[in-house]
Amino acid sequence: MTHYLILESRDPYDSVDWGNIQEMIINLKRNGNDVTLFLLQNGVLPARKSTSFAKYFADLEKLGINILADFFSLQERGIQEIYPSVEKSNIDQLIHLFFMPNTKIIWH
């Protein structure tokens, strides 16, 4: 089985194709792949508890998609509270994910 590691560095507020990438993530999972969504840089912005993305992240979690957010990116943007379906992570874990067997990486 292929593991897709999706690096999301763009936020939905200024990226017109953000929705298309998220649809691709869901389709990859529905087609039987393992999927990890790693939010970094401005990609962490929708993970803030005050945004309207709670249902979106909960739906991804229900599908079995792992959602990680880079701690440094959160800290740099002053984000302390994130949705429960999003786990704080770091670059060390990201590098570990790079080297998992059968992993394909997509950066957006």
Which role does the model predict for each range below?
Residues 15-32:
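Histidine-anchored nucleotide/phosphate-binding helix
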Residues 3, 30-36, 66:
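Residues at the starts of beta-strands that form the adenosine-phosphate
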